[in-house]
Amino acid sequence: MTEFLFDGPKNADRTIVLAHGAGAPMDSDFMNVIASGLAKSGLRVARFEFPYMVKRREDGRRRPPDRAPVLLESYLQVVAELGPENLIIGGKSMGGRIASMVAGAAGVAVLVCLGYPFHPPGKPENSGPNISRPSGRRH
């Protein structure tokens, strides 16, 4: 069972799931500011941590992110626990990348990526994952 950090109204029409980036936890300053702003707009915000960050919180040791299969499964588990109906998924940097990789399989309609590198610096031809639904990018 995933431990969530919730912000916003419990009876919101939509919930947005936010995953942290590679180096900072779900309650980092950046994530707190974003969650607060989204909650003030009427969204319910659900933050969670990938397994490697849970371990870091338990023992204080920094470690690299889990391999992609673990991150993907973890995000899909979060979606299953909350239910994909009326769910927006996303995250900061690595968390956004993982969200973009599970969006189709998760059955969610909206994806939000914050601080997400859609392509390596100076290489726009190497764009991010193949997102098959209408999308817009705001830099």
Which positions does each model-derived feature cover?
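Serine-hydrolase catalytic machinery in alpha/beta-hydrolase-like enzymes
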Residues: 1-87
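Active-site nucleophile loop of the alpha/beta-hydrolase fold
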Residues: 50-51, 113-121
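Conserved hydrolase catalytic core segment
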Residues: 101-110
